[in-house]
């Protein structure tokens, strides 16, 4: 093939022959790799066909409070009683033996472990925060806490899937996919759903956490790397000019569209048409959106980009979480609908899974997130973006009140844990719900995580009962078949 003349005899063979030939020289976008990775050569989900342009903006069901959402996911399960859920009774009874009911766990009795952190009330609202997060403590009046969440799984993999997709098994669309499906994207030149991972490793269950499940692949998350070039394979192959590549993609999409007209239920192909067009646009838009050199030195300092406390030895660049928070702000500023940042990777001490010692775990991870999150909230506010951006913080579950092992470790606990929300439509300076006096189990105003999902959808302008996708003979919903309750106490 003569790459200098891409229009010569482009349609001489069959469509499949054309795609196969182009796979060898489709520039850095790697057509064949994209087709294979996205399952083009495999089976196609038997789902309803999406709209002709899957990511076109859609009208919300409700008066929308927030236009975008940034989900800060603390992988491993942060310890609520060492960060936000102050439990003086637990501290008083430190070292005493207690029998605490557990489901599907071997340990139900042991010694209570009080927190070594110092708690203080902050802001006009008097919200409790420990000394592990001194910068974030200054933002307490922006946060709405739900301290009585509970979930169904003690295992990281299934708990993460449930927090992301509402189910403890793979194959279901993630919340970002539901938002993309329900609202579309405000910027057709950037992904509507972006995921940024910790350079220490991706979370357990991997891409299933940001999968579109049985929905078209157009709604799945696009992963940005933590360091170096965030999106691989965007640079054109040497000798291929922008007009040549534009002609090439137009021809591919024309052939795909003709094929789609004959096979209207082929949702994977429809997603690929949109993906190739987006990939071409990303070659121009992504470098600008991700260029932190355009930010002022004061902004970089605010996010901790030059602060060694926000760094860690396995990073691919300085202050990865601070960089990701700043990139998240730049993305929502440009109309990206949903950005999810995972903090914590690998195993145990590389994430929030504090089996071997909660104090050491907090000393590692809290400085990495404290300054960047406080900066993100303050930056969104000073730019007038906080009212239209929903920020969500939390993990897949919390930690137990009992000590694990011979030190100061804590085991998993889905029976009672804390999340906080800030921004669009949220009543800042609020603490809703309570765990028991030991922080072990949700006790007052208990809410299953399906209620959190319904609340997030509501804040984004979507009615959980109307946001449905027909699959398997049913109108499927993020919140499942059990009717959820919107957590009204968090709403402004």
Q: Which residues does each predicted region cover?
A:
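Ligand-binding pockets and gating/stacking loops
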Residues: 1-492
């Amino acid at each position: 093939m003569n790459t200098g003349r891409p229009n010569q005899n482009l349609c001489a063979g069959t469509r499949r022959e054309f795609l196969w030939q182009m796979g060898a020289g489709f520039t850095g976008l790697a057509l064949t790799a994209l087709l294979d990775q996205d399952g083009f050569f495999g089976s196609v989900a038997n789902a309803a066909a999406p709209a002709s342009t899957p990511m076109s903006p859609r009208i919300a069901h409700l008066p929308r409070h927030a236009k975008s959402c940034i989900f800060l996911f603390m992988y491993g399960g942060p310890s609520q009683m060492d960060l936000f859920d102050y439990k003086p009774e637990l501290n008083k009874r430190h070292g005493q033996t207690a029998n605490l009911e557990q489901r599907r766990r071997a340990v139900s009795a042991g010694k209570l472990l009080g927190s070594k952190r110092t708690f203080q009330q902050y802001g006009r609202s008097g919200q409790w925060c420990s000394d592990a997060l001194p910068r974030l403590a200054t933002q307490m009046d922006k946060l709405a806490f739900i301290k009585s969440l509970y979930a169904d799984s003690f295992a990281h993999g299934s708990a993460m899937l449930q927090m992301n997709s509402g189910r403890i098994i793979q194959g279901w669309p993630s919340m970002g996919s539901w938002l993309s499906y329900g609202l579309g994207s405000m910027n057709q030149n950037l992904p509507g759903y972006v995921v940024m991972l910790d350079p220490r490793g991706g979370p357990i269950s991997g891409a299933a956490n940001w999968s579109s499940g049985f929905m078209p692949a157009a709604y799945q998350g696009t992963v940005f790397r933590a360091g170096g070039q965030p999106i691989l394979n965007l640079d054109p192959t040497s000798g291929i000019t922008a007009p040549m590549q534009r002609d090439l993609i137009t021809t591919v999409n024309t052939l795909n569209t003709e094929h789609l007209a004959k096979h209207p239920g082929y949702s994977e192909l429809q997603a690929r048409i949109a993906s190739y067009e987006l990939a071409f646009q990303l070659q121009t838009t992504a470098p600008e959106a991700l260029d932190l050199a355009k930010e002022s030195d004061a902004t970089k300092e605010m996010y901790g980009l030059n602060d060694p406390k926000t760094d860690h030895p396995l990073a691919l660049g300085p202050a990865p979480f601070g960089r990701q928070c700043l990139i998240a702000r730049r993305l929502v500023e440009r109309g990206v609908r949903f950005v999810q940042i995972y903090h914590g990777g690998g195993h145990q001490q590389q994430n929030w899974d504090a089996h071997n010692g909660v104090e050491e775990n907090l000393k590692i991870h809290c400085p990495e997130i404290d300054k960047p999150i406080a900066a993100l909230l303050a930056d969104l506010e000073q730019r007038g973006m906080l009212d239209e951006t929903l920020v969500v913080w939390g993990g897949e579950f919390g930690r137990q009140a009992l000590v694990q092992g011979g030190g100061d470790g804590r085991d998993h606990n889905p029976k009672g844990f804390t999340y906080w929300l800030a921004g669009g439509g949220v009543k800042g300076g609020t603490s809703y719900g309570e765990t028991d006096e030991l922080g072990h189990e949700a006790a007052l105003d208990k809410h299953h995580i399906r209620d959190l999902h319904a609340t997030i959808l509501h804040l984004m302008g979507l009615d959980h009962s109307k946001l449905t996708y027909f699959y398997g003979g049913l109108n499927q919903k993020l919140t499942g078949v059990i009717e959820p309750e919107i957590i009204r106490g968090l709403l402004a």
